[in-house]
């Protein structure tokens, strides 16, 4: 009974506070900010996601694109970025082809200020990994 009451209370809180709408808006904002970073750091390939569940593909932009226009995956750099992110306090998962996709899976209650901190720390990790902005 306690578990059911807790679950119901949680669902009501999510509905009453429009958490899904907030998360959708934050996700779109964050993908836009990552697109800005992508312009400065071409190792950032495709950025995709739903809400705040976002994947950041890490690629080799100096190599030839395949028949679909995609750069080769860079699993090594992705692993290094994951490590550098961890050193700044960010925990990102890896997945995708050759482990080249960094996965952002924050709490649904993350604040806008915390998303700004993420962006700053992610850029710090790029620089620490030796990625040069263009």
Protein language model regions, located:
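Conserved N-terminal phosphate-binding loop of PLP-dependent enzymes in the Aspartate aminotransferase
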Residues: 1-134
């Amino acid at each position: 009974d306690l578990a059911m009451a807790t679950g119901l209370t949680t669902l009501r809180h999510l509905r009453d506070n429009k958490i899904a709408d907030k998360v959708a808006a934050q996700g779109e904002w964050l993908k836009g900010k990552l697109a800005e970073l992508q312009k400065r750091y071409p190792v950032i390939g495709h950025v995709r996601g739903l809400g705040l569940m976002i994947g950041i593909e890490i690629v080799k932009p100096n190599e030839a694109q395949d028949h679909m226009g995609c750069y080769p995956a860079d699993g090594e750099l992705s692993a290094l970025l994951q490590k550098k992110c961890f050193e700044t306090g960010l925990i990102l998962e890896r997945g995708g082809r050759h482990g080249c996709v960094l996965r952002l899976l924050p709490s649904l209650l993350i604040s806008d200020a915390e998303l700004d901190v993420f962006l700053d720390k992610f850029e710090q990790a790029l620089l620490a990994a030796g990625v040069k902005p263009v």
